[in-house]
Amino acid sequence: MRSMLRWAALMGVGLLITGCAAQPLAPQVEEVVITQTPGSAETPAPQAGPITLYYPEGASQGDAAYALTYDLPVFSGTEPAVSAMNAAIEGWREELLDRVESERLPLADRAEGADLPGTQVTSLCVEAETPLGNFTSVLFYESDWYENENGATQRISTLVFDEAGLECNLAAASGVYDPLPLAAQQVWNIMSMDPSAYYGDLTIADVSESLDLYNGFSVAEEGYTLYVQPGILAADESNGRPLEFSFGRNALYPDFVGDLITVEEYEALLPQLFALASHCGPGFQSWQGEAFDPPEAFTHGFRLDSAALQGEALILRGQLIQGAPGELEATEVAVAQLTLTREQGGGWQLASLTLS
């Protein structure tokens, strides 16, 4: 089940996960080789070592029809966030076993003396600190090969966790309510720089359909990477590797960011905007600068559509949304107008909110 970002972490509530320390997996396989690898922000995640299963059940390497080898991360600690992440990874492992048994094994036809067909899974752990909190991305690279095929075909899937250990989609990680059109446009722009590398009859609608904003992206401190499985966009059909499209966080921000307000100023305001929306949203009340206690969780947000300078003030207009980004039931509930004024240090501060 895909859970969305729990915004309380942005207010200092929640667990900061630093590093991906490994623990041995429970012994339930035929062959286990332990290899310990130091973890870092962008290196293979520490694992319990490659684990190999032979198929059908009870087979050995010599008489097996198929083999599955996988390295999966196991996070150490007793915190609820750690338990939640490990449970999600275990769920992914169970899906992998089902996929191999139902989809890969029936295609295996190992001739006598031939190499053993199989699937191999490796993983990568990426941690990122962003304006909306800290995220851990786990990337699973899944390759499979058969005797009658040239080279292995590789697929990629991801799990992205927030500080509470809950799974996030791109909307939750970015704070953008509908990131698909913006993300597809970024991929389209990247493709346009080398059009011969892609099928010639593709449209931006095809690009949108190829994106998986739940289990096909990762978060880095610089921005986001989207992954597209092989054979969908790339013209080189002999390349069995997924495509990667990376772009900065600001690519998903409103058009006025970078013009009327800098990226840094906007990112500094993001947690405050969600806090204000969650404070005023339940009662549909306007706000004139009075102090309030930050909410334990963010239940509302803003979709900002336009901005304009009025004297020394910056006026932002858009919609108040009930529900946090990433929630399927998020709904527009009111027209919102925010007034920002300059701080003494030069940045922008929230001055008032009018809902109608």
What does each of the following model-derived ranges do?
Residues 6, 43, 265, 269-273, ...:
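Intrinsically disordered, low-complexity serine/threonine-rich segments
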Residues 16-19:
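C-terminal motif of bacterial Sec signal peptides marking the signal peptidase cleavage site
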Residues 1-9:
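Bacterial N-terminal signal peptides that target proteins for export
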Residues 21-250, 258, 282, 287-312, ...:
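Compositionally biased intrinsically disordered regions enriched in Thr/Gly
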Residues 177, 254-283:
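Glycine-centered tight-turn and secondary-structure capping sites
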